[in-house]
């Protein structure tokens, strides 16, 4: 190096370690000079082999430029100065969310409040429907209508249509506990066809399922309102008894049963009282009740109808494809004629569900004898039952034998069997 410029490198004490360091510093210094020379203009080139500059530069400015960071580029200084700087576009900065916060994104579809209200309404209606179905099952189990139907089919002979209509009306009414009007069943037919027997079976069944005999009222016209008694007293007594029964049933949330036998003997004042009890203007606990009227009114019309249409009646134990239509047409005619006849007597039968009981055929009377014999302790022998049935009077029409008195004389005939062994011993 030139002696006029003292070296900035420290003097090495030994040639062993300092020599490589000096070489590195020398190379670094050379690289810096070459970078600076490339950036200078052509007239201000430094002297070759030395670190001095030309007349336009000095060592102080070179060191000041070396201290600032420079970036290497292949463009010359004139090209860099001639370029116009481009205006950079400002990019939209990406919004960064903290990891601990919740990212709230805009909703693509905004649900209206009406849709939410509709969904809530559908849920409420579905819940009410399920609750109603459960109530239907509870009422059916409480009153054991299946057991009642089996008991009626087993004990009532010759009246399948009447039993089916009674059970259909009871199932429809007892499906719910709240009603808008009471149920009035009017069982009509001639003597001995099983009306009173059905009334006793209904009363026995409801006493068992309700577990309270006070909720079943049986009213007999001849017994509770005999001829010398004033009619107004009977009317007040009937109204009070009905009010007590329905009030107790309302407190226990049950449906009471009120059976009125021999309704054809009831005075008009009592029929008026019953008609008032069935009105919708009454208190709501009067609506939750079942009334059963057992009446012989219309028995003559039913007898004439059966005898005139005996040829259209199906024989027993026969089930054909057209049996439904064959049975429905006469039954509808009979119901229409009975309703017109009874409505002329009193307006009570306008709201009643009329159930006609037809005449009993001879095989049905034989079954009545066997049933009574078994109940009295006798062996229900078929031949003996047929022999007893031969002693009754019948209508002989179109190959059928209809009992004139039905099963009314069965009890008396069976009671006579107890004296036959005594007569045989003589």
UniProtKB/Swiss-Prot annotation:
The modification Phosphoserine is found at residues 58, 76, 101. GO terms for cellular component: cytoplasm; endomembrane system; intracellular membrane-bounded organelle; membrane. The keyword Membrane applies. Its main location: membrane. The keyword Protein transport does not apply. Residues 41-60 are annotated as: Disordered. Keywords: ATP-binding, Membrane, Nucleotide-binding, Phosphoprotein, Transmembrane, Transmembrane helix. It comes from the Eukaryota. This is Torsin-4A. The lineage of its organism: Eukaryota, Metazoa, Chordata, Craniata, Vertebrata.
């Amino acid at each position: 190096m030139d002696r006029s410029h003292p070296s900035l490198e420290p003097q090495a004490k030994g040639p062993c370690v300092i020599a490589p360091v000096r070489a590195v510093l020398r190379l670094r210094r050379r690289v810096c000079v070459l970078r600076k020379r490339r950036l200078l203009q052509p007239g201000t080139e430094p002297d070759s082999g030395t670190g001095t500059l030309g007349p336009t530069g000095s060592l102080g400015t070179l060191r000041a430029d070396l201290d600032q960071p420079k970036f290497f580029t292949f463009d010359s200084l004139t090209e860099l100065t001639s370029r116009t700087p481009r205006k950079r576009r400002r990019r939209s900065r990406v919004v960064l969310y903290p990891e601990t916060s919740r990212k709230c994104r805009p909703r693509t579809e905004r649900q209206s409040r009406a849709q939410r209200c509709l969904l809530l309404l559908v849920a409420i209606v579905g819940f009410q429907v399920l609750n109603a179905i459960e109530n239907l099952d509870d009422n059916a189990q409480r009153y054991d209508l299946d057991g009642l139907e089996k008991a009626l089919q087993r004990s009532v002979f010759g009246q399948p249509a009447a039993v089916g209509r009674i059970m259909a009306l009871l199932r429809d009414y007892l499906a719910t506990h709240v009603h808008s009007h009471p149920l009035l069943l009017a069982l009509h037919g001639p003597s001995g066809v099983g009306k009173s027997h059905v009334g006793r079976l209904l009363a026995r069944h409801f006493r068992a399922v309700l577990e309270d005999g006070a909720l079943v009222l049986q009213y007999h016209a001849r017994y509770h309102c005999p001829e010398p008694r004033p009619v107004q007293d009977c009317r007040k007594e009937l109204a009070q008894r009905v009010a007590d029964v329905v009030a107790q049933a309302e407190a226990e949330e049950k449906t009471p049963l009120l059976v009125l036998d021999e309704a054809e003997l009831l005075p008009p004042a009592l029929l008026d009282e019953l008609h008032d009890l069935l009105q919708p203007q009454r208190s709501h606990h009067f609506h939750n009740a079942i009334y059963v009227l057992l009446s012989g009114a219309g028995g003559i019309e039913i007898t004439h109808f059966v005898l005139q249409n005996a040829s259209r009646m199906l024989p027993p134990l026969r089930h054909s494809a057209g049996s439904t239509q064959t049975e429905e047409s006469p039954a509808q005619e009979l119901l229409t004629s009975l309703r017109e006849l009874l409505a002329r007597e009193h307006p009570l039968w306008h709201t009643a569900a009329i159930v006609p009981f037809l005449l009993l055929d001879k095989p049905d009377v034989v079954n009545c004898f066997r049933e009574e014999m078994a109940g009295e302790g006798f062996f229900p022998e078929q031949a003996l039952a047929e022999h007893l049935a031969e002693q009754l009077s019948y209508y002989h029409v179109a190959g059928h034998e209809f009992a004139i008195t039905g099963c009314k004389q069965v009890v008396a005939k069976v009671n006579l069997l107890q004296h036959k062994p005594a007569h045989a011993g003589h």
